[in-house]
From Swiss-Prot:
Main location: cytoplasm
Pathway(s): Cofactor biosynthesis; NAD(+) biosynthesis; quinolinate from iminoaspartate: step 1/1
Names of required cofactors: [4Fe-4S] cluster
Protein purpose: Catalyzes the condensation of iminoaspartate with dihydroxyacetone phosphate to form quinolinate.
InterPro entries: NadA, NadA_sf, Quinolinate_synth_type2
Binding site residues for iminosuccinate: H39, S56, Y127, I128, N129, S144, H213, P214, E215, T230
Keyword annotations: 4Fe-4S, Cytoplasm, Iron, Iron-sulfur, Metal-binding, Pyridine nucleotide biosynthesis, Transferase
Name of the protein: Quinolinate synthase
Amino acid sequence: MFTTALAQRENTQLGELPLDLFAAIQSLKKELNAVILAHYYQEPDIQDIADFIGDSLQLARAAEKTNADVIVFAGVHFMAETAKILNPDKLVLLPDLNAGCSLADSCPPEAFAAFKAAHPDHLVVSYINCSADIKAMSDIICTSSNAVKIVQQIPKEQPIIFAPDRNLGRYVMEQTGRDLVLWQGSCVVHETFSEKKIVQLKIAHPEAEAIAHPECESSVLRHASFIGSTAALLKYCQNSPTKEFIVATEPGIIHQMQKLAPDKHFIPAPPMNNCACNECPFMRLNTLEKLYWAMKNRTPEITMLEDIRLAALRPMQRMLEMSV
């Protein structure tokens, strides 16, 4: 039987919120010896109060190195799980346990176990955007920052399963020339961008560069002058002489882009429908208020079975070793 994370889903919110949430959270950080780790897709207030902001690889490294007793993870469930995998003795809190991930959910453990059994000679490289159960069935974990680098280090004669993101897998295939067996999972946000609307934006803004995350579909990626992880996109915008960018990833990252390059203009790539579908609904579940209550009540906590944690730790460690 597969068990991902056993978590306390009660987050009892008693009493009134303090008038100055920022000050109250800073006070709780000292009291708990806590660190707040936040992904680039979080709301601006959470990014501004976080001790560390990063992409999945940066956050995994920060979680591995922290001396804090409590890790408050402002991200989604698999990210908090990753912190727990690397820090079994620390209290890991997630402000809202319903902050899941459509990509992680697209790879059910039972179905993936059967898929893996059908390819017994294959090495399993799994994108970090997956559950602890999938990590436990993997040989190496990767992120969008290092996926190409990791696959390039695997002997060419070794067949590979790449899971769960088919778009990132396809991008890795193009960059490495390797033939990968792809699990057909995807991120609903990165598959919602409209190629037609991006082309229209490029016509309306001829000086703008389109940049994209490799989780996007190939029809979107072909219009991008730069493709990279969230951290790579940030660095590119900061260093490029271009003054205007069309950004094909979750628009939460634009907050950091504007802070790092205040003289530049960033246009979020539009979705196919007239909706806010380019915003991750799971990332948006975390709020400053929920972060405060999580620290105040020390719940919801991420826990998992030790055998799952140990099995998931090995491919995580291999990733960190191969990413030096």
